[in-house]
Amino acid sequence: MDALEVLKQRRAVRSFEDKPIPKNILEDIIDCGRLAPSANNVQPWHFVVVTDKETLKYISEKATYGKFIKDAAACVVVYCEKENIHHLEDGAAATENIILAAKAYGISSCWVAGYDRTYEKDINEYLNVPSNLRMISIIALGYSTQNPSPRNKKSLNDVLHWEKF
């Protein structure tokens, strides 16, 4: 699948097959996250990949809109060093790279907000996350049980402005 196809076909999926993702594919997906742009090339990110069913269940119980995480093959929790003033932007870029790399492998995903959520502290403690890191996102990964249709999006004419607004 070429890059533009990946961008245009990506959909948020919340229903997954009970099928593991091979470790080498997970590593390659994370490597794509590692290659994301970051302000001043600081690369402030760390990625926790979770495949253990009990841990996935724990995260799904804590994450407000992530109840489906328990059924995912894996989830990735993206962290950034919080003293970096651009940690949110950098972590979001890494998150999107992971989602797009997964799609290129035929793996579906759903980005669950993690930043400044009430559940961040509990999940951080459970995963033994150092205190200098801030949760940016949780990404559920797995092979979809569905083929979601494209959702309605604003037209290009509604959002594109040439030269001035």
For each predicted feature, which ranges?
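Acidic, surface-exposed loops and disordered segments
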Residues: 1-165
